[in-house]
Structure formats: structure tokens, C-alpha cells
Amino acid sequence: IGTCLVGSEMCIRDSYNRVFQAKPQLGSNFKPFLYSAAFENGYNPSSIILDAPIVFEDDNLEDVWRPKNSSGRFYGPTRLREALVQSRNIVSVRLLQELGIDKVRSHVQKYGFQEDEIPNDLSLALGSYSSTPLQNAKAFSIIANGGKSIEPYYIEKIVLPNSEVLDFSKTKTLDLRASRLWNGYNLSLIHI
């Protein structure tokens, strides 16, 4: 009790398990599930959606909503293949609008997303749904396994034939110079 599959060193002390308890928004990680709904409903990777400015006015919003691509640019007619690879927000919002929110909400439940937690608005296209990392990994495993859902399970320990128990808790610290070098490379990659 109090151990974690993924987390910080504080995990054991405060017993907050990020795998089971954290529920960050999926963001662009949600887009493959949206596109899956599109492909199931007659769209294909070559289908074209307009990537152009769009404005939504809604009394429930404090202001108008103008979704944008992360680049701040618009790309005109865009194939779904390119839109998914480039994570184009406008295409995703328009696609959700064309498909209908109810249809997409129904479809993504096949991946284990909980109906009562799925947003009922166009922000869903941008991943406003919150999910635990375990739920997210399970959903993606369905895609990776060709549509087969496999229930994740926890391996507590592995005992070798000589009765030796593998210790997964042993960590190795790399040479500090190598660590600093890699951190520099990682920072440069962030800015690409």
C-alpha cells in the first residue's frame, strides 16, 4: 500500500498514485479517438476539412470562442491524414461539429471513456476530457491491438527459477556529466 507505478519519490510517502488517481485533460491525445469515429462514419485519411478561422458564440460562454492551431496559422483545405499528424485544432473542431457530439461521445465509449465524464461540447475535439494515465493507456492499447481490449494487470514481482526475486526498485545514476549533457540536448529539442 502506498507504492506507485508511476510518480515521484514523494509517491511512497503521500500515497498519491498518478496512474490511478491523476486525471489530466487528454489534450491532443484525444484526437486519434475523434478521428477513429470519423473513419467509422465514412471519412477516410484523404477526406478534406477546411482549416480556416471559425468563431462560436454561445450564451454559456463568457466570450466568443475562437479555436486556433498551435502555430496560430490556418492551412486551408486539409486532408485528415495531415490534420492528425500535425494535430490541427481547427480541423478537429470542424470534424467534431460535422460528425455530431453525440455520435463521437457514443463512439469513444468503446475505448473505455466514461459517458458521464465526456464533455458535451466542441471543446471535446481539443481533448477537454480528463482521464487517468491508466485509462488513457488502455484506450490506446485497443488501437495498438487492432481493436482488442486487454485488461491491464499489475506484476508485483518476478521470481526467477533459482528463487531470486528481481528487484525493480534499484535505480542507477548516470555519470553526472552525461546527465547534464542530455539535459542540454533535451532542452534544445523542446524548442524545435
For each feature predicted by the language model, list its residue ranges:
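Single conserved hydrophobic/aromatic residue that forms the stacking wall/gate
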Residues: 1-7, 12, 190-191
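Secondary-structure capping and boundary motifs in well-ordered enzyme cores
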Residues: 22-27, 72-76, 80, 84, ...
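Conserved catalytic neighborhood of penicillin-recognizing serine enzymes
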Residues: 43-104, 149, 161-189
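Glycine- and acidic
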Residues: 13-21, 89-90, 119-124
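Active-site SXXK
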Residues: 24-51, 83, 139-143
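Active-site-proximal helix/loop microenvironment
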Residues: 111-166
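Active-site beta-strand/loop architecture of penicillin-binding DD-peptidases
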Residues: 8-9, 13-24, 36-37, 143-144, ...
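Short, charged, amphipathic alpha-helices and their helix-cap/turn boundaries
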Residues: 99-116
